[in-house]
């Protein structure tokens, strides 16, 4: 479903290696039959994440765009989102019926947030392998994202992380804002993310938009 300014735009951020691109891949593959989707990735000097999505068959190549942000990927999603806004506009011109655009941030800035001008909903991905103190450290991604994803829960026993502590800290730091524990390799928790995007974003599957 398109909003007043076009498709629903979901920003996906988080540290390098947390599972952002894996989540992008799964969301595309899980939603592409029901919605008209495009994906935009941000990398500093390459288009590696976009190329990964193409190789994985997430969407057809013409629906995937890679933005090369240069040295400051944080700026490209926040202070000066013009490159990403241009990429969204190009996708809309190619696919006028777009329902959903997924936008993956680049870089490793733990404080990176999406401009409201660029993203309608934000998902922040962290992973258990970075330690169970991450949720308690706060920062805008942890406290203010619309949905927090705590990924790689299967690694907890191997890195000495307590999922109970991460759960309690996430509740304390986020208040009423939702979070999901996931193992994206096995798709555990994926349905809750899909449900969040559809419900919070007001998406209606193609079959329902007669």
Curated annotation (Swiss-Prot):
One Gene Ontology term, aspect cellular component: cytoplasm
Subcellular location field: Cytoplasm
InterPro entries in the cross-refs: CobW/HypB/UreG_nucleotide-bd, P-loop_NTPase, UreG
A matching Pfam family: cobW
Record GO biological process: urea catabolic process
Gene3D superfamilies in the record: P-loop containing nucleotide triphosphate hydrolases
Binding annotation for GTP: 14-21
Free-text function comment from the UniProt entry: Facilitates the functional incorporation of the urease nickel metallocenter. This process requires GTP hydrolysis, probably effectuated by UreG.
Family, similarity comment: Belongs to the SIMIBI class G3E GTPase family. UreG subfamily.
PANTHER family named in the record: UREASE ACCESSORY PROTEIN G (PTHR31715:SF0)
Subunit-level organization: Homodimer. UreD, UreF and UreG form a complex that acts as a GTP-hydrolysis-dependent molecular chaperone, activating the urease apoprotein by helping to assemble the nickel containing metallocenter of UreC. The UreE protein probably delivers the nickel.
Protein name from the UniProt record: Urease accessory protein UreG
Source organism of the structure: Rhodopseudomonas palustris (strain BisB5)
